[in-house]
């Protein structure tokens, strides 16, 4: 559902809401400046600003497209800026596009086309009311306050990502077998999206700080430099966090390889023991099969040697012990020769 709020700001910093677009535009001609805040507007609603405030039709098209990258474009009557708001909740990164138009005596914000039910600028009216000094600088001061608010929201997203990276590291170290590596892949994708957005937003602030925009007064440039510093810091954080993700992936792979090696060694040890047992009993099985131990006379002809059975068992025991000793010596020789 679309919403719109219109405000007029006096030179002293006082502001009040108005309902009619023509009335608020007429009020701006008497002094002060205006803020037109649109949430999910229809295209026709924005097209009325083309004639009334000199907004370029292509900029209106960009406002309706939710797949734009941050940028700044200069026109004769205004400067068009696309900035992003970050919202990170339930392990999902939402990037909401904020469209801003700044002119000599107006600021227009358009948001909500890619934010579901989120309202990125819902708190701005309350924030502006508590910061009258900044908005006395005109549209430049209001633009700075909005961009500064959006940058603060980015910090919240980075805090949550840092906590998730620490949690992932603890899980990998505690029990790598039960860790899901897809978590790291998800975090890496989020960082890639953040990096892409921050890269373009830094370029916007560079152009603002070197006074490329004629509608931003020089007195407010110091405030925009502060925003640039924050964006540069966040950009460096994305690089740092990406390196941490890579390190955690390598750590996880290394620990998994260690577990597989340990499991393989245990399996080899079990097979070795079974092989030893089979090797010891193999000649005994052969002798027992030939001797036919189920009959007393199989090996004694017609004579019934009652001692033949115990002697045969004793011989088998001696052979078994001899086999065991021989096999152990062979294993030891193999170990020494392998060193």
Regions found by a protein language model. Give the residues of each.
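Hydrophobic alpha-helical transmembrane segments and their immediately adjacent juxtamembrane loops
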Residues: 232-339
């Amino acid at each position: 559902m679309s919403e719109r709020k219109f405000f007029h700001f006096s030179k002293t910093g006082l502001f009040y809401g108005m309902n009619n677009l023509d009335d608020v535009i007429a009020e701006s001609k008497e002094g002060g400046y205006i803020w037109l805040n649109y949430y999910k507007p229809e295209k026709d609603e924005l097209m009325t600003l083309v004639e009334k405030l000199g907004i370029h039709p292509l900029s209106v098209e960009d406002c309706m497209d939710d797949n734009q990258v941050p940028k700044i474009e200069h026109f004769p009557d205004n400067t068009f800026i696309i900035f992003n708001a970050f919202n990170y909740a339930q392990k999902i990164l939402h990037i909401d596009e904020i469209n801003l138009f700044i002119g000599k005596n107006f600021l227009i914000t358009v948001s909500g086309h890619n934010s579901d039910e989120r309202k990125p600028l819902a708190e701005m009216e309350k924030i502006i009311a508590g910061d009258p000094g900044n908005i006395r600088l005109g549209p430049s001061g209001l633009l700075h306050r909005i961009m500064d608010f959006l940058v603060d929201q980015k910090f919240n997203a980075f805090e949550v990502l840092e906590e998730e990276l620490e949690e992932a590291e603890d899980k990998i170290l505690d029990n790598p077998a039960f860790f899901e590596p897809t978590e790291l892949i998800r975090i890496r994708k989020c960082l890639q999206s953040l990096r892409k957005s921050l890269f373009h937003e830094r370029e916007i602030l560079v152009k603002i700080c070197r006074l490329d925009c004629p509608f931003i007064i020089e007195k407010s440039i110091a405030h925009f430099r502060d925003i640039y510093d924050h964006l540069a810091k966040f950009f460096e954080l994305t690089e740092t966090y990406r390196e941490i993700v890579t390190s955690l992936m390598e750590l996880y792979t290394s620990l998994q390889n260690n577990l597989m090696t340990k499991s393989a060694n245990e399996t080899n040890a079990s097979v070795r023991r079974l092989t030893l047992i089979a090797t010891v009993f193999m000649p005994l099985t052969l002798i027992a099969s030939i001797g036919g131990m189920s009959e007393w006379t199989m090996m004694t002809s017609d004579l019934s040697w009652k001692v033949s059975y115990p002697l045969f068992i004793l011989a088998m025991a001696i052979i078994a012990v001899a086999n065991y000793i021989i096999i152990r010596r062979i294993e030891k020789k193999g170990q020494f020769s392998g060193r």
